[in-house]
């Protein structure tokens, strides 16, 4: 209820009020759609509030897990919550230079993945990279010709300030470019529904 005290556009306030007034069945429907990566285009606003709540809850739960106990579940699946990655990042910190980590949009967990492998199907064949800017861009789309999906990849080795979830939204132009090219997004970010 504290969120109602925040300034927001009227449409957002109406969506928040609808979520707060929703009965248990409707809230379960919202949460099921968010957790299933299946947000209907005609009701994105209330789903965004539900997604924000899910992110906070999952991040709190993941923070309580013993990192050493986490084991790979499958390619492109978060070992903490089972969610899909929003993005992946090639790191540039000492000891993990040029190592790739996938970033979960649900719980914010980052986990190591093979650098040149599709996070959607696991293929190492037919991977390509596109960007809005230049070949030296720090945000690119890694697309797979095998499965027809793409996931955003950040080169934090070149730009350490990149954030895996916030800059996913901040690089919306790349989503538009890939959508217009007919390639399906493989990573999931509830704040980019429709792209």
What are these regions (language model features)?
Residues 1-66:
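N-terminal alpha-helical interaction blocks
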Residues 56, 60-179:
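Cys/His-clustered metal-coordination modules, chiefly Zn-binding fingers
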Residues 153, 190-195:
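Juxtamembrane/interfacial segments around transmembrane helices
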């Amino acid at each position: 209820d504290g969120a109602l005290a925040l300034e927001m556009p009227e449409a957002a306030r109406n969506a928040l009020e609808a979520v707060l007034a929703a009965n248990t069945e409707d809230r379960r429907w919202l949460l099921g759609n968010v957790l299933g990566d299946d947000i209907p285009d005609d009701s994105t606003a209330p789903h965004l509030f539900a997604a924000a709540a899910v992110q906070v809850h999952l991040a709190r739960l993941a923070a309580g897990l013993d990192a050493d106990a986490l084991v790979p579940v499958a390619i492109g699946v978060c070992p903490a919550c089972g969610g899909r990655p929003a993005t992946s990042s090639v790191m540039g910190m000492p000891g993990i230079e040029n190592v790739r980590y996938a970033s979960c949009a649900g719980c914010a967990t980052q986990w190591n993945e093979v650098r040149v492998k599709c996070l959607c199907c696991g293929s190492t064949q037919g991977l390509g990279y596109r960007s809005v800017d230049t070949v030296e861009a720090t945000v690119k789309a890694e697309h797979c010709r095998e499965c027809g999906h793409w996931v955003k990849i950040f080169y934090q080795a070149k730009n350490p300030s990149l954030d895996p979830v916030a800059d996913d939204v901040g690089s919306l132009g790349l989503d538009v470019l890939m959508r217009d090219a007919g390639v399906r997004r493989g990573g999931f970010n509830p704040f980019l529904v429709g792209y």
